[in-house]
Amino acid sequence: MRIGKRRKMSGELRVRRVSSWEFDLILREAEKYGELSHEFFSIVEGEYRDVYAVNESVWKLVEKLPLKPYSLGTFVGTIRVDDNLVEKFYPNIEFFSLVKVTKNYAVLGPKASFLFTTGKDVPKRAVKKLNWQGSRKILIYNDLGDIIGIGMINPRNDEKFIKNLKDVGEFLRR
C-alpha cells in the first residue's frame, strides 16, 4: 500500500470512492475476461481519474487523514474520455490480478513469453493455448501462469497474430 503527500499540480487533487457509474465501467472491463473479485475502489482525480484498489479498513483511515493522499492502495488503471468522447476504464496489468480470468487469454511458451516482454508481437505458432471469445484484446500469460501483458488479436495475420499492446517489460525499457 502506498500513501503519500499530495503532489504539487496546477489543479487540486480530490480523493473519493468510485461512483456507481465508474464501478460499472470497471466491472464491464473485468467481465470481458472473467469475474471481478474485488469490490472496493477509490478515485484520485487530477488531470485524469486514477483508479486504486483499496480495502475498506484502509479507506476508513484515509477519510480521517487531515491531508488527502495522492495515491493509495494498488493502482489498477485510469478512467478517461477516448477519441470518440466515450468515457472508458483503461486497466493496467495489475488490474487483472483482481479478476478471475476465464476467457480471452493466450498462454505462450518460454521463448515467445520472453520476446513478448521485450515488446515483440506473437506469431500464431508460438501460442500454446488460446481461449478467445470475440474480444479484440486478450490477456497474455507465460507457461507458469503469470500475466505478462495485454495484446490485440489479429486472426488474419499468422506472423503477427497477437500485437503487443502492453507488457511487464515496458517499465524496464523506458
UniProtKB/Swiss-Prot annotation:
InterPro entries: NIP7_N (IPR040598), PUA_sf (IPR036974), UPF0113_PUA (IPR005155). This is UPF0113 protein PH0281. Belongs to the UPF0113 family. GO terms for molecular function: RNA binding.
